[in-house]
Amino acid sequence: MTTPLTWHDVIGAEKEKPYFQQILSQVAQQRQAGKIIYPPQEDVFNAFRFTPFENVNVVILGQDPYHGPNQAHGLSFSVRPGVPAPPSLVNMYKELEQEYPDFKRPNHGYLESWAQQGVLLLNTVLTVEKGQAHSHANYGWEVFTDAVIEQINQRREGVIFLLWGAHAQKKGRFIDTNKHFILKAPHPSPLSAHRGFLGCGHFKQTNNLLAQQGRTPINWQLDPIE
């Protein structure tokens, strides 16, 4: 019986590289200078904490973290409990309602239960300055998250990648479609959701692909938070 691979096994060496250390020091300097950086330091790598490498069956790629107060906590599209679901996530709920008539839109936007079921909720850039979208886009995070995608591609099989919008779809070049599945649609943002995200059927298609492989489908329903 082989020991399951951990994130440390597959990306530990990547995190030792000079460019990665440079990202961490750059972000730390920004925080020390009094800038507000999201998510908080302890949450930056939550996507990896909540979804162990051996559990990754689905990847939903985001771009960079939400840049409003108390929103970002290290999972793409997700917000902390008590914070209203942002517009992109509301559109994801609308799509779930279309695909699953029994889906009840939750009173929150906290997606931890998806992550714990094997949905890696990965942003391609892992930090952002308050109120400034894409402010850390050139820090080098994408070198790291590209390496993450490459490792999933190499060492896992049958993973379903949900690539919404042009930014996420660029990452498709790392994915071998002979061993994995890619589902593409426009981004769920209000700017583009009506161009084909709404009606894409991706949540149900994901579960059909999991079931075909004998894997447990995702329960997309989120329990209410009191």
Swiss-Prot record:
GO terms for molecular function: uracil DNA N-glycosylase activity. It catalyses: Hydrolyzes single-stranded DNA or mismatched double-stranded DNA and polynucleotides, releasing free uracil. Keywords: Cytoplasm, DNA damage, DNA repair, Hydrolase. Its EC number is 3.2.2.27. It comes from the Bacteria. GO terms for cellular component: cytoplasm. Its main location: cytoplasm. The keyword Transcription regulation does not apply. It is found in: Cytoplasm. Pfam families: UDG. Excises uracil residues from the DNA which can arise as a result of misincorporation of dUMP residues by DNA polymerase or due to deamination of cytosine. NCBIfam families: PRK05254.1-1, PRK05254.1-2, PRK05254.1-4, PRK05254.1-5, ung. HAMAP family: UDG. Belongs to the uracil-DNA glycosylase (UDG) superfamily. UNG family. This is Uracil-DNA glycosylase. It comes from Proteus mirabilis (strain HI4320).
